[in-house]
A protein has these predicted regions:
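Ligand-binding loop in jelly-roll beta-barrel domains
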Residues: 1, 102-128
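A short, N-terminal "cap"/entry segment at the start of jelly-roll beta-barrel domains
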Residues: 1-49, 130
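Conserved short histidine dyad/triad with adjacent acidic residue
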Residues: 33-40, 52-68, 89, 101-104
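Short acidic-glycine-tyrosine-enriched beta hairpin
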Residues: 73, 86-102
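Short, conserved beta-strand element in jelly-roll/cupin
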Residues: 53-57, 66-85, 121
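Residue-level detector of conserved, well-ordered beta-strand and adjacent loop positions
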Residues: 40, 57, 77, 93, ...
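A generic fold-level signal
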Residues: 31, 44-48, 68, 92, ...
Length: 130
């Protein structure tokens, strides 16, 4: 992840030390079979990026195909899933790493018998400089 921090006025980010096992999952996008853990506050504009764990129960999926202006990557923590990158579906599993280019259409769903979970980084709270 290579990006210089982009300040927001006088707000300053601060150090957060947490164990991912101590962070509670919350329901993602009103779906009862997809859950998210946020490592940084999602409501504090001092932070220009975040780290999350997204976990899909078997059959759980993104609610739509999405794209992002930023590049980002993900590391698969558990299970297996199918992931759409551009126009290709590919199987991914625990210990795989995936890098997404900007504007690459993407979505996922969990397959198998255990949750499909991955950790990922993502820019947030800043407009893209054009």
């Amino acid at each position: 992840y290579k990006q210089k921090y982009i300040p927001y006025g006088e707000k300053k980010p601060y150090v957060i030390l947490e164990d991912s096992n101590q962070i509670e999952y919350r329901i993602y996008d009103d779906m009862e079979n997809v859950f998210i853990k946020d490592f940084l506050p999602t409501d504090d504009l001092a932070f220009d990026m975040n780290m999350h764990i997204l976990s899909f129960e078997p059959g759980g999926c993104h609610p739509f195909v999405e794209t992002h202006v930023q590049e980002h990557g993900m590391y698969i923590l558990t299970g297996e899933g199918m992931y759409l990158l551009d126009d290709t579906w590919m199987g991914i599993k625990k210990d795989d790493f995936v890098w997404f280019g900007a504007y690459c259409p993407q979505c996922a769903y969990g397959v198998g018998r255990e949750p499909f979970a991955y950790i990922y980084s993502k820019d947030c709270n800043r407009d893209v400089t054009i």
